[in-house]
Amino acid sequence: MTWTVAPEPPDSPVAKALWRAYYTEVSDRYYLLHRGHRTDPSELARELSRPPTTELSFPKGQLLVARYEGEPAGSAGIRLLADNTAELTRVYVHPKMRGKGGGKLLVLSAEAKARTLNATRIILDTRHDLTEARALYTALGYEETPPHNDDIYAEHWFTKPLA
């Protein structure tokens, strides 16, 4: 079984479907943990109706889509910030595809894309309950750092030099 990773326009049907799956999962996990219920359908509809970000389009960044046996199974975004720093964002692998190496491949592909944008380091933030993501980042050499933003949902911040 094989994985492939390739750039994808953020406004494509594939990207939109993966964004819906990503947002639904991380939002539901947050609300179930902190409020005891899933995301309110109106909030979900409002968030998903926003136009795709241009920050994940060249030359500012890139959205990458992972396909398993040709079927879309995950995504990751990379966006260039100031001072040769790139941010890794929206890393997602469909639950049925987890444990097959797709997350690692997406992150490594995003790092490679960041290098082509002349980034010398990569940063990210994540939540405490996203334990799978934190384990992946640590296994790939990311180090936890003090906060680099004030995102209300961020609870852990990581960085990695891009050699």
Predicted regions and their residues:
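C-terminal "cap" of GNAT-fold acetyltransferases
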Residues: 3, 120-163
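Acetyl-CoA-dependent GNAT
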Residues: 3-85, 89, 94, 107-108, ...
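Loop/helix-junction capping segments adjacent to catalytic residues or to phosphate/diphosphate-binding pockets
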Residues: 13, 100, 131
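Short, contiguous strand/loop micro-motifs
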Residues: 53, 97, 120-121
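Active-site acidic-Proline motif in GNAT/NAT acetyltransferases
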Residues: 68, 94-100, 128
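Conserved G/P- and acidic residue-centered "switch" motifs that form tight phosphate/ATP-binding loops
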Residues: 70, 101, 118
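Conserved acetyl-CoA-binding loop-helix of GNAT-fold acetyltransferases
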Residues: 93, 99-112, 135-139
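Conserved GNAT acetyl-CoA-binding A-motif
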Residues: 107, 114-125
